[in-house]
Structures are given as C-alpha cells and as structure tokens.
Amino acid sequence: MPESETLVVFRILGVLAKARDLGHALPVAEIADAAHLGRPSAERYMNMLKHAGAVRAEATPTQLLEYSLTRYGLERLVGGCAR
C-alpha cells in the first residue's frame, strides 16, 4: 500500500529536525536517503515544503542547494510553538 503524502512530509520534517539539532542543513541526496525516497520525489517534496515556508533553501559554495527547517516547519512538526 502506498504511503500517504502526509506521512512522507512528516518523515522529511523529522529528518530536517534532526539536522537542525546538529546545526546544519542537508542536501537533497541526504534527505532522500534518510527519508527512504528517490531523489526526484525528494526534490518534489522539498519544493512543495519550500513554497509552504516549512523549509529554507541555501546555496553552498559547490552550488548545491541545502535545506534546513524553518521555525514554521518545526512548529508544524511538534504541533505548537517552537522556540
């Protein structure tokens, strides 16, 4: 049975929350690997989350985009006010 998009989104937010705790952003390839997704699917979800304001894309010196969780995204994940 295919997973719901909601489950996938929360799995991605969880991956980004762990990276946030360590103080760094993740490239799409690492997000895809950690969330057990193919890279095209991960890119589609990251674009959707970026447009929703849940993640922030940052360019690196190697021109790869890395993503980090915004406060809004963290609040969606924990269901309240994140500090």
Model-derived regions: residue spans:
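Glycine-centered, phosphate/nucleic-acid-interacting loop/turn motifs that mediate DNA/RNA or nucleotide
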Residues: 53
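Short alpha-helical segments that sit at the start of domains
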Residues: 1-15
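Short, hydrophobic-biased segments on the C-terminal half of alpha helices
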Residues: 46-47
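Short acidic, hydrophobic short linear motifs in intrinsically disordered regions
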Residues: 22-34
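Short, amphipathic alpha-helical interaction segments positioned at domain boundaries
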Residues: 72-83
